[in-house]
Every structure is written in structure tokens, then in C-alpha cells.
Curated annotation (Swiss-Prot):
Residues 156-302 are annotated as: C-terminal hotdog fold. Terrein shows anticancer activity on various tumors including cervical carcinoma, ovarian cancer, and head and neck cancer. The secondary metabolite acts as angiogenesis inhibitors through the inhibition of angiogenin secretion. Terrein also has anti-inflammatory activity. It shows an alleviative function of age-related inflammation characterized as an anti-oxidant and might therefore be a useful nutraceutical compound for anti-aging. Terrein may enhance osseointegration by decreasing the level of ROS and has a potentially synergistic effect on osteoblast differentiation. The gene is terB. Residues 14-302 form the PKS/mFAS DH domain. Induction: Expression is induced by methionine. Nitrogen starvation induces expression of terB and promotes terrein production during fruit infection, via regulation by areA and atfA. Iron limitation acts as a third independent signal for terrein cluster induction via the iron response regulator hapX. Finally, expression is under the control of the terrein cluster-specific transcription factor terR. Keywords: Methyltransferase, Multifunctional enzyme, Oxidoreductase, Transferase. This is 6-hydroxymellein synthase terB. 6-hydroxymellein synthase; part of the gene cluster that mediates the biosynthesis of terrein, a fungal metabolite with ecological, antimicrobial, antiproliferative, and antioxidative activities. The first step in the pathway is performed by the polyketide synthase terA that produces 4-hydroxy-6-methylpyranon (4-HMP), orsellinic acid (OA), and 2,3-dehydro-6-hydroxymellein (2,3-dehydro-6-HM) by condensing acetyl-CoA with two, three, or four malonyl-CoA units, respectively. 4-HMP and OA are not pathway intermediates, but are rather shunt or side products.
Length: 952
């Protein structure tokens, strides 16, 4: 196809698009424009984080002008799709912007429609920067993709335009006069919806649609995303792509715009928007993606705090057992596994044996038609229920899936197993399905947690990846090896693959996930020849067992040479995957159904597992119990722990049940416990375990004589000491217990002694479990790793039978304040990890009585309560009655499903209080005193006038 040069040539220069470039030809038409602040003041009215930014709507307007120049001024409307913003164009006030637009015709689509590829770039000196790419067409309309938002009516609750623009300015984006065009803004509190009126104030005769008006429509998406409330706007959002957009060339007058936002993955949001004029004629309709952009300066300033985070110690944790597949009848993945089996069996029922993926499943279950199929323990019941029974089961399972987040994958699985054609959806639909599928592949959520525990134990790991170099495998691991604040938990990451081309994946990953070093690996060569260092790697990840070569035994020997004594080998192919997931992955990635479904090459994988076992690796849990856990994590078999045959157990003069249980557990492992007290002469050469803090912390009321004896004991001991004390860091009932922690840190540093502290609570965990954990810690003391970058662990805590260790991690001021506010609740609710506080949730089946709460601060708090679950609220004050000042606010809460009961009375009058409680429509779960006076004043001078206001 060629561009109509004659129509394009007859148009004069246009401000935004510019003049036709001399190098234009029939296959590529191009324009050049130069914009400046004097002639285009609107361009300088959008400032993002202190820098002027070219609005996304400007690219849409340029695309529309291209179509107008190809239509001989007869353009009714134009369409764009797949418009992607590659980079932001930022500039200074005095800059002149040079834009280059290129238009190339594409082949006619299946409906004989002509689309053009458009590229917009900026040029500064001799350097060109790509800004935007996409497709544009004149008078091409796909009614199936246009959202009809106007038929639902406007949203109900008003938002002040001044409040909105001031609020986003505080977040980092300032709109000038021409850009502040949203009026009569209203939002919906139950959905992410917003409406607004646009009053055009600029001359639009020079373009199809002025970019300012288009930008106003896009602005509304951010209003809808946070329901017009500043406290819900954590970060600014910007448009990063436009899936489709139709813009009319009708005269623009007063417009009403509606926007609906649906949350997506990775914090991306999808926004549908439309605009109509006063006569109800559609002017603009489309869909875009908006993405939060963090204020990096604000984030870096916020990371001024750190906290001690306690997590499970991977040394004492069965990493394999946690990867066993979850098989509940209510689990969506189990339902999809059953559906895949039933679809395959139904293909036989209806004579569709040629269906390739169903044929593959039938081959997998064999001719006997019994036994396990993925997450289905036995296929016999599904085989024996007959065609009609299978049809009924399919209906039931489809209904179960339809209401879950996996419903779209269920539809794709049905097409995969019932149709004989390849995937026919768009590339965008394919990518959305793959994005949803990817977190489920190889049980990545649980796998990431296991990897994170390893990295938490040793945040300075040296990681070696051996495999095909697939980017998705590398990204899965790299994502797990980072903290919540995006700090990497490894020292080095070496990705070795069999070919040079495969190393490009890790290179791309390194841009966003950390420093990854690529390497070409040959299993037939020695490790020294390839620059690998023996005994240097803490974690070796095998993404493809074929990377170890044809000789599994030789590959296992190489792994044994490469791994550190305390390191782990991860066989990624050993992670269990549902069969439906493997089939659907092949279907979406266009792999042949006759090829491998992605399941492991059984003999090869088993050969590697067996070879690792023969070379001294073990897969079982620390207690050597036989389990059904998958063989994923392997480590070198640890030598028998070097423990003494006797240990001194120092306890109080009274009987402590925990000590008796410790004696029994240690005795079962041939370790004799010799009981003693702090007043006895304790042999200096024997290991010591101390239990003297459980009545009263030993050092809290220590005398001078006792301190002298204590120092003599610690300074003279030649063995190891474990000091067992009540919990003080994870949760604490008596802060005096923490005194021993600081003292032991000092003595460990001053006297260079091996002193370990263990925190526990015998009232929360059974003594049998505690004694077993203490034995594990004691046996592990001699195996603690130590390097120049990482000290061994000397502090442990036992929580619900799980051994935890602390690490210092960064946090923000906001997270720290939230944590401090939740500490009081944590003291009553039991052990909690000192991590970011969980989201507050109010009980929907209970009622909350608010005393006051109808002022500005009280309304904010009550609205927040409703957003977080509260569904029954009584407002109790002398002014709590329906009226022009209160009813609109009450209706806002009612629109969110909350029953609001205002009650007029005084909290100082007991009969009023009793009557107010009788109004409750559900059991009262809380009474909140919300009366307050929002004034800053020094109460020492004259508090009486203010106290009167508070009491009211």
C-alpha cells in the first residue's frame, strides 16, 4: 500500500504536525514541527516532578492531524490502537521542541480496513529519541471495543476541582490554567468511576481535536483510580499506552466525560473512558493503561528507618515440603485440572479423537484409564461416570471457575481442548493470558518464598544459574531475591547457558533486576576452563537438566565441586506443575501439540536426582522423615554434628517443666544434661544452656557479687553457651527480658565467646516442640557458616515451633509509624513478625458507636472505616441528625453498603447512652470517642473554652 501523496501535499503547515519533510515518499510520509512557548502556551502547562512534560494527548492529536491531511478535510473521525509511549519528552521553558512524525501504510486487515503505523520522535541536536509508536486509521470503527459508559449515568458524589488539582500538585504534577479543565467532578465510592464536564476554552479550528481536551479525558482516569480521594492516591499515575481510541471531528462544545478504572497486575490499571456533547452525540471513546510512577526523591528520603525483621531460618526448614501441591476441592487449579481431563474424555464421547491436546492427555492417562493425572489422584471416577455425567461435571466445574480470577484461563483451556485450530486471539490477549499464567508456572509463589528464605539467611549469596538462559526462569529467581524495597539479596548472579544467544535473556533481566553476568557453559569441559570457581556458590539453580550434559553422574560431580558446604542446588524442573497449565502454556506459545508439553524429561530428571544422591546430596527434611515432598532443593549431606556428650543445664532453684523436657530430648540423642544453678561451680570446659530468666530476668536485680560471678563464668568458659530467655523482640510482655540480649552482645564482643541467645514462650508453644527446636539449634552451632561478609547467627527465636533469625532491613517512615500504631494490638493478639503492619479490617457483622465524628476529621475516619469493612455505624452526638449538612455524607456511606444510624443525645447522660446502644442493628464491637477541636493552641494558658467544645 502507498500513501496518497497528492492529498498530503496540498495541506499547509499545521502547528502540531508541522510541514511535510522533503524525504517523504509513497511508502513513507513524514512531517517536522517546531513548537515553542509563545505560540503553544498550552504545551508548557503540565509539570511532572518539576519538569515540563509533553502530554500524551499531544501524540493522539498529531495522529488525528495525519489522518485529516490524508482525507481531504472530509474526516468524520479517526481511530488509534496499540499506541505505546516509549519515553517521556521533558524540556525546559526556553526549549524549542522539534518533533518528527512518520506514517507508513500497513496491509489491509481481515475486514479490508487500512491502518497506518505512526512513529513520533524528538530531535535534540543530532540525537533522536523515539517517543510514541502505534497504529492510526481514518474512519475505522470497531464497535465491539468501544465502551458504552454514558448509559450508566454520572457518578453521584461531587469532588471539588480545586481540591483535586491542589492534591495532585502536592503529589508531583502541576497543571497550568489551560490544563485545569475538569469541572463538576463526581465519583462513585463503590466502584472506580468518575464523571466530569469539560468546557472548551481554546480555539480548535487548527486541529481535529485539540490535545488539551483529549488530555482532560485522560486526566479523569486518575480521578477514577483513587475515587477522587487524595489519601487513596499513593503515587501519581500516567498513561503508558492506549489500546484503542476513537475521536470524532464534530464541533467540540460542552462535553460530559465518564471514566471507569479496573485494577490490573503489577499495579497497572486499565481505564475505559468516553465523552459526549450536549446533544448526547459521542465525541471520544477509548481504553488506556495508566501506571503509577513513584516519586523517587520522596522514596529515597523516606528510607531513613530500619527495623529488625524475623523470618524462618532456612537451615531448620524443609524447603521441599512447602512445595508440595495444594489439593483442595475448592482450589481453582484443581478444578481446572479436572476440567482438562473431562474435556479430553469428552473428545472421545463426541468422536473428536483428532483434537491434538486432548489426544495428548488421553495418551498420558493410558489405556487402563486409572491412576494419577496431575492434581487428580485417580482418573477412574471421571472415566466411569459416562458421557452424560461428564457433561454435567463440566458444567459444574465451569461454574466454579467462572467466579474466580482464573476464569479467563478457563475459557482459554476450553478452546485449547475443544477446537482444532491454533490460538486465534490478538497478541495482546495472548500476552494478558500468559501474564496471568506465569505466576502459576512452577508454583512460583511458594517457590519464591523458599528462595527468599535462603536469601534472607544469606543476603550475600553467590548464585549460579545453569540452563537454557530463558528470561522467564531468570526473572522468577531474580524477583524472589529482592526485598520489598527492591534491594538485592545476593552478592553475584552468574547465568550460564549452552549457547551465546541464550545469554541475551539474562542481560535484559539485569537492567531491571540486578547485575547478572552471562556465561556460555559447556558440560563437557572442566569448570576451571570456563572461569567457574570450585566451592564458591551458595545457590546453584538448574533451570534445564540438559545443561548438565548427557552424563548425569559427571554433572553431579561438577555440582559437588562448585557448591559450598552449606549451599543448595535447586532443580527447577522438579517443581510440580498441573497438567492443564502445561497444556495451556503450549497452546498460547504456539508450540506443537505433538511436542513436549513442558513436563520434565522423566529419565533425564530422575537420572540427575539419582546422581546427586549418589554424590552426597540429600533432598529429605532435617528430621530424615520420608515425605511426599518433591525433589527440588538438594544440599550436601551434613556431617554428624560435633556435640559434647554432656551439657550443663543451668536452671532456677524451683522446678521448670521445660528443663525436664530438654533433659529427655537431649538424652534421646545421647547428650546427658547435668543440672546446675548459678550458685554452683560450673565446669568451664562444658557447653552450657541457661534457663534462669523465666521467673524474673536474671540481670534485672543482679547484685554486685552475682555480677562478678557471672562475668567470671562467661570469661572463663571454653565451650558454647545458649542463654534461653522469654520473648523480648518479636513480642514482649516484660521488657526487662531484653536486658540479657544487650549484655550478651557486649560480652560476645568483648570476650570473643560463642554465646547464643534463644527467645521463646513456654505458654504459647508446647515444651516438647521447644526442646526439639533447642536441640536443632544446639546441634547446628558447630555448622554455622562464617565469611568476611556475613557473621554467624547468635540470636534465635522459637515461635510456634518455628526457628527464626533476625535481619536488619530498611523501611519507610510511613511503614514505621503504622507498625508503632499496631504494637498495642499485637501484644494482645500474640506473636507477630516485626514487619509492615497488616491492613486494618473492621468487622462487617458488628456495629461501631462513634461519639461525635461529624466534623472534618471524624468524617474522614468514618469513611476510612467503611472502606475497610465497617457496615454498621451509629453517630451519637447532639448534632447527629438528618439534615442538609449531614444527609449527603450519610448517603455516601450508605452507597458503600453501610447502615448509618444517627442518634441525637449527650454522652454525659447515661439514659442517652443506653438508648443509643439500643439502636444498634448488630452487636457493638467498638465505641470510639471522636470529639475533637482542630485548633493549635497552648493549653497551659486558657484551656476552658476548648474543653467545653470537646465535651459537647
Amino acid at each position: 500500500m502507498k500513501v496518497d501523496m497528492h492529498q498530503a501535499e496540498q495541506w499547509p503547515s499545521q502547528r502540531l504536525l508541522g510541514s511535510r519533510a522533503p524525504q517523504s515518499n509513497d511508502n513513507e510520509l513524514s512531517w517536522t514541527s517546531v513548537l515553542n512557548s509563545e505560540e503553544d502556551p498550552w504545551l508548557y502547562d503540565q509539570i511532572l516532578f518539576g519538569r515540563r512534560t509533553f502530554p500524551v494527548a499531544g501524540y493522539v492529536a498529531i495522529a488525528g492531524e495525519c489522518m485529516r491531511q490524508l482525507s481531504d478535510s472530509k474526516l468524520e473521525f479517526f481511530s488509534t490502537k496499540d499506541l505505546s509511549i516509549g519515553s517521556s519528552l521533558v524540556f525546559d521553558p526556553d526549549d524549542k521542541l522539534e518533533l518528527h512524525t512518520t506514517l507508513r501504510p500497513q496491509r489491509l486487515d481481515e475486514e479490508n480496513r487500512q491502518w497506518y503505523e505512526i512513529e513520533i520522535a524528538s530531535r535534540n541536536g543530532g540525537q533522536s529519541t523515539a517517543l510514541c509508536t502505534g497504529l492510526v486509521a481514518r474512519e475505522v470503527l470497531d464497535t465491539q471495543i468501544l465502551p458504552d459508559l454514558t448509559r450508566h449515568g454520572d457518578s453521584n458524589w461531587p469532588v471539588s476541582p480545586d481540591y483535586w488539582y491542589d492534591m495532585v500538585a502536592d503529589r508531583g504534577i502541576e497543571y497550568g490554567a489551560s490544563q485545569r479543565g475538569l469541572n463538576d467532578i463526581s465519583v462513585d465510592f463503590t466502584e472506580n468511576k468518575a464523571s466530569a464536564t469539560i468546557l472548551p476554552a481554546l480555539d480548535t479550528t487548527d486541529s481535529v481535536a485539540h490535545p488539551v481536551f483529549i488530555d482532560h479525558c485522560l486526566q479523569l482516569s486518575m480521578v477514577a483510580a483513587c475515587k477522587g480521594q487524595g489519601r487513596l492516591l499513593a503515587d501519581l499515575s500516567v498513561v503508558t499506552s492506549i489500546q484503542h481510541l476513537v475521536v470524532s471531528n464534530n464541533a467540540w462544545s460542552k462535553l460530559r466525560v465518564n471514566s471507569v478504572v479496573t485494577p490490573g497486575r503489577l499495579q497497572n490499571l486499565t481505564c475505559n473512558f468516553s465523552a459526549v456533547n450536549e446533544n448526547g452525540l459521542p465525541i471520544l471513546s477509548g481504553q488506556c493503561n495508566i501506571t503509577p510512577i513513584p516519586d523517587l526523591e520522596r522514596q529515597s528520603d523516606g528510607k531513613l528507618f530500619s527495623f529488625i525483621n524475623w523470618a524462618t531460618d532456612s537451615t531448620f526448614h524443609n524447603l521441599n515440603q512447602s512445595l508440595a501441591p495444594f489439593q483442595s476441592d475448592l482450589d481453582s487449579t484443581v478444578a481446572l485440572e479436572r476440567l482438562a481431563l473431562l474435556y479430553a474424555l469428552r473428545s472421545e464421547d463426541i468422536g473428536a479423537q483428532s483434537q491434538p491436546y486432548s489426544k495428548k492427555i488421553l495418551k498420558k492417562i493410558g489405556t487402563k484409564r486409572k491412576g494419577r493425572f496431575g492434581l487428580v489422584p485417580d482418573v477412574s471416577p471421571f472415566v466411569g461416570c459416562g458421557p452424560s455425567g461428564r457433561a454435567e461435571l463440566i458444567k459444574l466445574l465451569k461454574a466454579q471457575i467462572s467466579g474466580t480470577e482464573l476464569s479467563s484461563l478457563g475459557h482459554a483451556l476450553e478452546r485449547c481442548l475443544t477446537e482444532n485450530t491454533p490460538f486465534s486471539g490478538s497478541n495482546r490477549e495472548r500476552q494478558l493470558l500468559l501474564d496471568q499464567l506465569h505466576p502459576l508456572i512452577r508454583n512460583s509463589g511458594t517457590l519464591c518464598e523458599s528462595l527468599r528464605l535462603l536469601a534472607y539467611k544469606n543476603p550475600k549469596m553467590n548464585v549460579l544459574e545453569l540452563g537454557s538462559g530463558r528470561k522467564d526462569s531468570s526473572n522468577l529467581v531474580l524477583k524472589a531475591l529482592r526485598t520489598q524495597f527492591d534491594e538485592q539479596l545476593y552478592s553475584s548472579y552468574l547465568s550460564a547457558s549452552a549457547s551465546l544467544d541464550a545469554t541475551t535473556g539474562p542481560k535484559e533481566s539485569s537492567r531491571t533486576n540486578g547485575h547478572v553476568q552471562p556465561l556460555v557453559f559447556d558440560a563437557e569441559k572442566s569448570i576451571e576452563e570456563q572461569g567457574l570457581k570450585a566451592g564458591s556458590y551458595d545457590l546453584i539453580i538448574i533451570t534445564d537438566v540438559a545443561a548438565l550434559g548427557s552424563n548425569a553422574a559427571l554433572g553431579a560431580k561438577s555440582l559437588k565441586r562448585l557448591i559450598r558446604p552449606q549451599g543448595h542446588v535447586l532443580l527447577l524442573e522438579g517443581v510440580p506443575e498441573p497438567e492443564w497449565l502445561l497444556v495451556l502454556k503450549d497452546y498460547l506459545t504456539k508450540e506443537s501439540p505433538e511436542a513436549s508439553t513442558g513436563s520434565k524429561t522423566k529419565s533425564s530428571f530422575e537420572d540427575v536426582s539419582a546422581a546427586l544422591t549418589k554424590n552426597g546430596f540429600v533432598f529429605e527434611d532435617p528430621d530424615n522423615k520420608l515425605t511426599s515432598a518433591p525433589k527440588v532443593f538438594a544440599r550436601l549431606k551434613q556431617p554428624v554434628p560435633e556435640t559434647s556428650s554432656e551439657i550443663t543445664v543451668v536452671g532456677p532453684t524451683y522446678h521448670l517443666p521445660l528443663i525436664r523436657e530438654v533433659e529427655k530430648t537431649f538424652g534421646d540423642h545421647n547428650i546427658k544434661c547435668v543440672k546446675s544453678t548459678m550458685d554452683d561451680d560450673i565446669p568451664p570446659g562444658r557447653d552450657i544452656m541457661v534457663f534462669v530468666d523465666f521467673d524474673e530476668p536474671y540481670v534485672y536485680n543482679i547484685t554486685e557479687a552475682e555480677l562478678s560471678k557471672f562475668v567470671k563464668l562467661v570469661s572463663g568458659m571454653k565451650g558454647k553457651m545458649i542463654w534461653v530467655t522469654p520473648s523480648a523482640q518479636i513480642y514482649c510482655k516484660n521488657p526487662n527480658s531484653s536486658l540479657i540480649l544487650g549484655l550478651m552482645r557486649t560480652m560476645r564482643s568483648e570476650f570473643k565467646k560463642d554465646i547464643t541467645t534463644v527467645e521463646l514462650d513456654p505458654k504459647r508453644t508446647m515444651n516438647v516442640s521447644l526442646s526439639k527446636s533447642l536441640l536443632q539449634i544446639y546441634e547446628g552451632l558447630s555448622r554455622r557458616g562464617k565469611s568476611k561478609d556475613l557473621d554467624p547467627d547468635y540470636e534465635y527465636a522459637i515461635v510456634d515451633g518455628v526457628i527464626k533469625t533476625p535481619r536488619l532491613q530498611w523501611t519507610t517512615a510511613e511503614a514505621e509509624y503504622a507498625h508503632l500504631a499496631s504494637l498495642r494490638a499485637e501484644q494482645d493478639s500474640g506473636p507477630q513478625s516485626c514487619h509492615m503492619a497488616a491492613t486494618v479490617r473492621f468487622r462487617p457483622d458488628c456495629c461501631y458507636l462513634l461519639v461525635g465524628g461529624l466534623g472534618g476529621l471524624g468524617r474522614m475516619i468514618s469513611a476510612w472505616m467503611v472502606e475497610n469493612g465497617a457496615r454498621h455505624i451509629i453517630f451519637f452526638s447532639r448534632s447527629a441528625k438528618e439534615g442538609p449538612e449531614t444527609t449527603p455524607f450519610f448517603d455516601r456511606l450508605r452507597a458503600q453498603g453501610c447502615t448509618v444510624t444517627p442518634f441525637v443525645g449527650s454522652v454525659t447522660n447515661l439514659p442517652d447512652v443506653e438508648e443509643a446502644i439500643k439502636q444498634a442493628t448488630a452487636p457493638v464491637a467498638g465505641v470510639i470517642q471522636m470529639s475533637a477541636v482542630m485548633r493549635v493552641r497552648i493549653f497551659a494558658f486558657d484551656p476552658e473554652p476548648l474543653l467545653t467544645g470537646i465535651e459537647g
